[in-house]
A protein has these predicted regions:
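Structural motif
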Residues: 52-55, 105-120
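Extracellular/periplasmic periplasmic-binding protein-like sensory domains
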Residues: 19, 47, 144-220, 232-233, ...
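Periplasmic-binding protein-like
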Residues: 10-16, 68-73, 124-134, 140, ...
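Segments of small-molecule ligand-sensing domains
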Residues: 203-216, 227-295
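Extracytoplasmic ligand/sensor domains, especially the bilobed periplasmic-binding protein
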Residues: 1-104, 154-178
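Extracytoplasmic "Venus flytrap"
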Residues: 72-84, 135, 187-190, 211-218
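Hydrophobic alpha-helical
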Residues: 1-6, 111-112, 118, 125-147, ...
Length: 314
């Protein structure tokens, strides 16, 4: 959608994707950083790979491991970005003293992860990470258990965002870890309604009879930003005026402050990206059944309260 808006000269605001795959994937030559150019109409707010790597390694540092890490990266935009030797996990893990065992890219919806599991067992892996779709992680985790492979830590992007995906694993989902973008305990409120994060989540659960999920905050923030932008333009049909208003945004939202001011970004992405805070958490099995997501590391965003410490998978 962002690519189409850019080509048509229509202002666009997007979210819920790490900024590197979003930005780099839309470039004419993703493999040539020197050719990357900013966009005229497409703007994005979310965290980046540098943030998820920091969150994961901060969580891992709470437990004693041999620093052997297994990588699970699919052959898609996210997997290729996360596993990239220049901008992904490999160089940063190496800097931090971890050894990454990467068996290579696999196809989404694979039904056999024997090669990956065998590579991890041979490499004495105690930590696994990656970015998987939920059915693939379910397949991998069930097969790993069948083959007697249980790492101390499993920090997986994308697959573990929703409670339903973890509940599908039964009791085997206990202490799986993931990045955490938004929760009811985040200390932010809506600029539209004044509702706190907890009030927004409670309202969603009351209306839908379903558990809250992380994207709720970001979807709400899209409406906050759109309303704020339209309040600041005298002609909402003028694409260039609307785009200028987007670029000038300075708004405290339910997911944190939004401003496209280039903070904590490389020069090539400074115009079009706004970073949002990220922390890490573990899914904990409740005595009553089901799971709670507990924030276990907030070093990257100390204003977001932690609810516990990392525990090993057993």
């Amino acid at each position: 959608v962002s690519t189409t808006c850019e080509s048509e000269g229509l202002p666009c605001i997007s979210t819920v994707a790490p900024w590197q795959p979003w930005f780099i994937g839309q470039q004419g030559n993703p493999g040539d950083p020197a050719s990357w150019k900013p966009f005229g109409y497409a703007y994005h707010f979310f965290w980046g790979l540098e943030d998820v790597i920091s969150v994961y390694t901060n969580m891992w540092a709470q437990l004693s491991t041999n620093k052997q890490v297994g990588g699970l990266f699919p052959n898609d935009g996210d997997g290729n970005a996360w596993g990239d030797g220049k901008v992904g996990f490999p160089p940063v893990l190496s800097e931090k003293g971890y050894k990454l065992i990467d068996p290579g890219r696999y196809q989404n919806l694979s039904d056999d992860f024997s090669a990956q599991i065998n590579a991890f067992k041979s490499g004495n892996v105690e930590v696994i990470t990656g970015v998987m779709i939920p059915p693939d992680f379910t397949t991998f985790w069930n097969q790993a258990k069948q083959k007697g492979f249980t790492p101390k830590i499993a920090s997986i992007g994308k697959a573990l965002l929703f409670p339903q995906a973890v509940e599908a694993l039964g009791k085997q989902g206990h202490n799986l870890s993931s990045e955490v973008w938004w929760t009811p305990s985040h200390p932010f409120k809506s600029s539209l309604t004044g509702a706190s994060s907890k009030e927004l989540a409670d309202g969603f659960m009351a209306a839908t009879k379903r558990p809250w999920t992380q994207p709720i905050g970001f979807v709400h923030a899209l409406f906050e930003i759109a309303a704020d932008v339209l309040k600041r333009v005298d002609d909402p049909t003028d694409a260039d005026k609307v785009t200028a208003a987007v670029a000038a945004t300075k708004l405290d939202t339910i997911v944190g402050p939004i401003a496209w001011n280039g903070a904590k970004l490389p020069p090539f992405a400074a115009k079009n990206i706004c970073k949002t805070p990220l922390v890490g958490g573990q899914w904990r099995l409740k005595d009553s059944g089901g799971y709670d997501l507990v924030i276990t590391d907030n070093k990257t965003a100390p204003n977001i309260p932690a609810g516990g410490k990392m525990e090993p998978i057993v």
